Amino acid sequence: TTINPSDDAPAEEKPIEELVTNAAFNSKTATGTSDYEFRFTANCDGVLSIWDSEDNAIATDVAVAANTVVKPATTTLNVGKNSFRYVFTPDAGYIPEKDMVMSSYEPIEGTFTVTYRTYGVEGQSIYVAPGKYGVGTKEDPMSIYDAVKYVQPGQTIVVMEGTYYLDKTVKVERGVNGTADKPIQMVADTDASSRPVFDFQGLCAGMVLAGDYWYFQGFDVTNSANAQKGIQLSGKYNTMDNIMTYHNGNTGLQVSRYLTTDEFDMWPAYNLILNCTSYGNADAGYEDADGFAAKLTVGDGNVFDGCISYNNADDGWDLFAKVQSGSIGAVTIKNSVAYGNGYLEDGTDAGNGNGFKLGGDSMSGKHVLENCVAFDNKAKGIDSNSCPDIKIKNSTSIDNESYNVALYTKTAENTDYEATGIISYRTGFDSDTVARTAGLNVKEDLEPKGTQDIKKIYKTTNYFWDTASKTSVNSEGATVSTDWFKSLDYSAILDGVKSVGTITRNADGTIALGDVFALTDKAPAGVGADFSHDKLTASVSPVIGESVATGDTSNIAFLLALFLMSGAAIAAVCIYDRKRRIVK
């Protein structure tokens, strides 16, 4: 049947969707410093005004842009609870998207409370212990939850030994910062005989660390809830030193942004993850749990140095980026080892299992992999994962089940890979010393595109696996021989069910690979990874100040001030009374 268009029913207009109006403070609610900066976000444009408890204006009609963190004012806090009142008024004409309006343009009124409290002074140490709720002295330690709220720049949180059975996330809120000269330390008790363990009992995310200039050292994080990370590092200029993350419900230690509204300038940057180990992390679906990750929302200057990642459900390292959030900052991984990923410790066949996965969505990253070893991973050893411009220096990739080295992209028109000193090798044996003929027939995946200078990939210092000759060959036809290595027997590291064996650490935290994959004088200079002790970065021995002596010193200061004021008032009354008598 043919219908004349003039007889059609009138076109229906697309319904207008309403977006619920949201506005809230996202600055810290507890602090150990009196100087305070407000942070506020809303999902629409508008203006914000703030008043203190005595109705003194702190901020008046400060412009707020939608989905942007605004810093409307600073103030000086009083000891104890500080209450503030605010009014946010949405712009009446604000349209969030086409065919969409805000659910309400009426002013939003609310209150916001910040607690200011101090324990001790700069240079002193606050002690925490399992199940304790004291005042932070060594004899009467406090909870880890209170310590991370009220610690001051230049102080140390000393984590006493034992297992901390925790039921909520340990969160260092944004704004709880040290400084470059006065960092905040959170370190294991150097007098203890065992490492402290934060066990989250499968109930929640582990630690979310959004402060700047912190130094974390010497503790373990385990058993976060399914799909929740062990540690999320979201601040800047922090160091994670000798931290172990294992058996968490998602990635062991991940660098990524704190809030979904954070733009690139707020993404975590210039953090050092030093001599840390991450293993056995697995989500229920075996899809997301990596050992380490710096992905999706990562700023510049983040470095992994001296880390070990093994037997994680997904990848050893994941530097994934995607088009929706854009490129991430360049990440450096050096002096590190990835093995056995994609299999759990009991041999369970889990997720993807790449050793070092260095990109995503064909986004530029310029990530650097230097002096690293990847072996016996379920999938690829070194994987660009479509990133078109990674740099690999002096690294060894051995006996990975898929490609030892994969440099490829998908949608990028040009690549700019740089590779120097690569040894890709296959022993022909798996961890059970059974011939692995399939592995010998897995070539590299090297796919330069467009303007790529192939001399940056194929050169005399790079030895890639050749399936025809069953050996590793450089650009001039020279080959790798077994006498280049002191040992290719890593069976002492892996047992029959792929659990950890004997990768140990030296007393200073550096990796002790021993003779495994170490090169002899038969190998040419400038190739492969070198884990000689002098090439590695040692951990730092923390300086722990004296214990805080009196607990909440802010209350003491307040009482002292009242005492002095009272004394002055009494003295004034006495003087007045004396003068009155003299006059009489």
Pin down the residues of each PLM region.
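Acidic Gly/Asp/Thr-rich repetitive segments characteristic of extracellular carbohydrate-active
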Residues: 123-166
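Acidic, glycine- and Ser/Thr-rich low-complexity intrinsically disordered tracts
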Residues: 27, 55, 412-543
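All-beta strand scaffolds that present successive hydrophobic residues in beta-strands
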Residues: 159, 186, 214-218, 238-241, ...
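Feature marks extracellular polysaccharide-active and adherence modules
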Residues: 129, 160, 173, 187-189, ...
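C-terminal membrane-anchoring or membrane-association module
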Residues: 567-584
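Short, compositionally biased P/S/T/A/G/V-rich stretches that sit at domain boundaries
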Residues: 2-33
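Right-handed parallel beta-helix/beta-spiral solenoid domain characteristic of secreted/periplasmic
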Residues: 177-229, 282
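Short glycine/acidic-rich loop motifs that flank beta-strands on beta-rich extracellular proteins
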Residues: 167-170, 200-209, 224-233, 249-255, ...
